[in-house]
Structure formats: structure tokens, C-alpha cells
Amino acid sequence: MSAGPLTVVVAGAGLTGLVASYQLRRSLGPGARIVVVDPDDRVGGKLRTVDTQEGPIEVGAEAYLGFRKDATDFFESLGLGDELVTPSGLPSTIFAAGEVRSMPRTTVMGVPASSEGLQGLLSDDTCARIDAEGDPEQTAPLHWVHGDDVNLGQLVESRLGREVVDHLVSPLLGGVYSCLADDLGLRATVPQLAETLDAMTAVGEPVSLTAAAQRVLDQRAAANEARLASGAVSAPIFRTFRNGYRSLYDTLVEQAAPELELGVGVEKIAEAAGASGSGVKDVTLSDGRVLRADAVVLAAPAPVTGALLADVCPDASEIIGGVDLASSAVVAMRFDTEAGLPEYSGILVAADAGLDAKAFTFSSRKWPHLGERGGAVVRGSFGRFGDESLVKLSDDELTAAARADLKSLTGFDAEPAEVVVQRWWGGIPRYDVGHGDLMRFADAALGEVPCIAAAGAWHRGPGVPACLSDAKAAAAKVVADLA
């Protein structure tokens, strides 16, 4: 043990780091010293609430998956239950083949079960190919190896055609991962589909992508019917915070009561001299200070986490440091008028549409608490893995691109009263083929090193609930090691 109070250093003041700090405080008590270090000058990481003249808006993640009851329960345990709000229920749309169309309901993250509802969004030939894919007399069954992982875009294109990738799968996944489907692995991004393909193979059924998608949809429908039959209230698809995610990260800081070291990074982690096997680490900060820590939780981006593990866990260092990152930008615009803005929650943009934006969220339509303020709030999203050209544009250029695309899609051409441009450099990890296996190898290596854990959006999922779960697991690991 280090001299003085039990000390845990948390590298990263984003959601993962703050939740880990909160869990550590609950487990270790008020006497523990918890030090949260972050090179940024603010807490929250990729969650960022900014103030406008009409109230707070989000320029990072906007919402979380409402069916993740564990996340909602956690927020309520923090005393934030009254802050949670639900969307309006207005439909979302997709722009493809030159038109804005209703979002199809018979797909699994864009992978269709049939051509129903896809006419116009896709060509007649592609619709016919979708309907033939599950018929062994027209299309050879899919060769699937149980437990295997494949490139999502390549799989969908090989079975259903390029249009399905560009008009459905890439737009739906682009907002989550800032990647085209061609840059993602199936098992990490659409796990239910991969598991269903495994199940079909295990019992010797003819395997097809559309049949697997239909089975996933059927399972979801059955689960929903069971919930309704039990009297349970159906969970909204999304939830967010009335006053922004700032409510969450400020509350976590207040209740975890860590020492905040903002504007300073962690440069190196090494086993403390004379502390072999004890788990005690020397944590060198970017300003030259060295903190003696009984445990360390790494809640930083993958390249940073990988570099910091170099001396204490080389195997995990190499794996985690190899996770690629995608950059993106959000252009949040507040308008004094809503006249002419369509009555839906937003538009996803097909990958081959020829526009700069990949999506628009009509936040004031989607969220009643924002609509109550009057005027309109619209968020444009830009940037994909492997292409930072749009993210590198100036604020004025990005704003002009957002306004031009918004006008092209909707005809809405009001002058924004306020604009906030937020760039997320390397903000979203890429979930490539084999990502899950690599993370299991990294976890196994880290499990052999006492009093250190790593978590974050690069690990088990980029969404808010996934980061919550990951942070809790990381905190529990070091607490168990300290016991």
C-alpha cells in the first residue's frame, strides 16, 4: 500500500472515468483519495452541454437507449429521475435515391427481412434480390461458420447488393460509429444478427441474411408482447436529460468528490520501486509530478490507454492501442423560427447521396422540452472514418455546408441565431472485424495485472449505457484487487 490514504488515480474525466470514480467512492468510502486526471479543461469527455440564449443543448451524444433499464436505474439512483425526458414520437426519415422517405421498420440496423416498405428507397432489382435471398431455389444459402466474424458491408453487399449498404446500413450505423458499413465488423455492431446466424448454423438450417433478420424482428416483437402482457410499461426508444448531460456529469463529480486534475494528462504508469507484486503504481503526470497510486483506472481513448499500458501490460497495450478512431463534427444551430422545418425528428443521409452531412437531427421536433422554447434547434453531423476533410473545415465552412444540405433536403433556409461547432477528433472507436475477440484477449492480459483496469467507448460499445457498465466493471475489478 502507498503511504497515506488509499489512493486511486483515474485517467480520464469523461463519462466512463466519472462513473468509475463514483463507484470507487461508494466502495472505498470517504477516506479514499480518488484523483481524476484529464488533459482537457472540463469534465464530461464526449458528453458536452452548451448554453444558448434559449437554454442548454447537446453538441456531443444527445440521448441514450431507453430500453437499457440499468442506465435509467443508475440515473435515478443519483437523484436524476425527474431530469429524464422522452422524445416526441415524431418519425425519423432517410434521404436516398433523391427523396426523403419514412424510415423502414422491417430491418435490423438496416439489414432487411424483406423488401416490404423499401420500394423507392431501393431499386426494383434490389428489392427482388432481397426477396430471393432467403429462397434456396433462387439463392444459394449463406456459408456461415459458427462464431465467425465478417465485414458487415461486404456481407450485406454480397447477399443483397450495394444499394442496401449505401441506402440503409451505412446511414443507420454512421451516427453511432462515424463509419461506413464497409469499415465495421458484424459481431460487434449487430450482435443479435451474428448470434442468430450462429443459431441457424448450429441446428443445420439453411442460412440466409433475410431469414436471420426476420428472426431477430420476431424475437423483439415477442419480447415486447411479453412485457405488455406482464403489465410492464413499454420503455421509450431514447431518453435524455432536460437540462442536458451536464446534469449527469456535474452530479457524478459532486457525489464522487474526487480531486480533479484538469488540463494535465498522464504521461506514464510504472510499477512503483520496491513494490513488486503489490499493485502500487507510480503515475507520472504531464507537468512532471508523480502520484503514488494503490490502483489505477484507465478511462482514456484507446491510443492513450494503449500507450499508458506499455510498461505494465504490454499485451493489452498493443491490442488496445491498435483500435482505430474516427473523427466527427456536430454543427448545432438555433433558429428563431421553426416555420418550414418538417414535422419529423430528423433525416439520415444515404452514403451515395452526394451531400456533405451524414445526418440531421431536428432536436426541437424530437424533444418536446426543446420545442417548448420556441424556434428550432437542428444538429448536422459530419465526418466518417478515414476521411477528416469535412471535420478540418473552418467553422464558417462547416456551417455553410450544414445550411446548404439542410436547405437541399427540406427547403428550410432560415438564418441561424446561434451556431455551435463541435469537433470530436478521434472521438469514436472503430469496431472492426474481430473486435470482440481482441478485447477478450486484452481483458485476459489485464486480469493478470493487479490493481489496474481499463474501460471506455473503445471496449464494449460506444453508447452511454455501455460506458456505464464498463466503468462499473473496471471499478469493481480494482476494488476486488485492493481487498
PLM feature spans:
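Beta1/beta-strand and adjacent pyrophosphate-binding region of the FAD-binding site
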Residues: 2-16
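Conserved Rossmann-like nucleotide-cofactor binding loop
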Residues: 16, 42, 303
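Glycine-rich FAD pyrophosphate-binding loop
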Residues: 25-51
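Feature captures the FAD/FMN-dependent oxidoreductase FAD-binding
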Residues: 73-105, 160-165, 255-262, 267-280
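Conserved flavin/dinucleotide-binding core of flavoenzymes
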Residues: 104-112, 360-483
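Mid-domain catalytic core of redox enzymes
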Residues: 265-378, 383-392, 396, 408-409, ...
